């Protein structure tokens, strides 16, 4: 199904074609290509507002995920009952925040891909609220990014690396 990437900010230039290409590969690796996915790029002010409203945290952040299928357990796939259910949800990328925290040696597009992959894992029920949950999420991210690296030649590391 479709992957929609919307750029709703003007602070950071976004190259949507490489991000789309990589995220299409990530969706294939995860086996969720038949589901719709939205990726929305926003600035610090917008991501902070969303973070305040939905998480009670009045600070900008790198990624927020809003799943269409609530209560999925880590690694479960949604079970659509109608054509409208073929939707994973939306990932908001705080692209200004991501750029501000991007190391000089890192490729910004690669960091966006890693961050979006992290968000996609959240849409599939993975969390990092406890060490055990984090380990599952880290392993999933690592597996996906290693496979993606085989296609792209990049050496991508999970966003959740080092959380515990």
UniProtKB/Swiss-Prot annotation:
Keyword presence, Metal-binding: yes
Cofactor note: Binds 1 zinc ion.
Sequence positions that bind Zn(2+): 118, 122, 128
UniProt key word Metal-binding: yes
GO annotation terms (biological process): rRNA processing
Cellular component, GO annotation: mitochondrion; nucleus
Top-level EC class as recorded in UniProt: hydrolase
Domain of life: Eukaryota
Keyword list, A-Z: Endonuclease, Hydrolase, Metal-binding, Nuclease, Zinc
EC numbers, comma separated: 3.1.-.-
GO molecular function: metal ion binding; metalloendopeptidase activity; RNA endonuclease activity
InterPro entries xref list: MetalPrtase_cat_dom_sf_prd (IPR023091), YbeY (IPR002036), YbeY_CS (IPR020549)
Cofactor: Zn(2+)
Pfam families referenced in this protein's UniProt entry, alphabetically: YbeY (PF02130)
Family: Belongs to the endoribonuclease YbeY family.
Function text: Single strand-specific metallo-endoribonuclease involved in rRNA maturation.
Protein name in the entry: Endoribonuclease YbeY
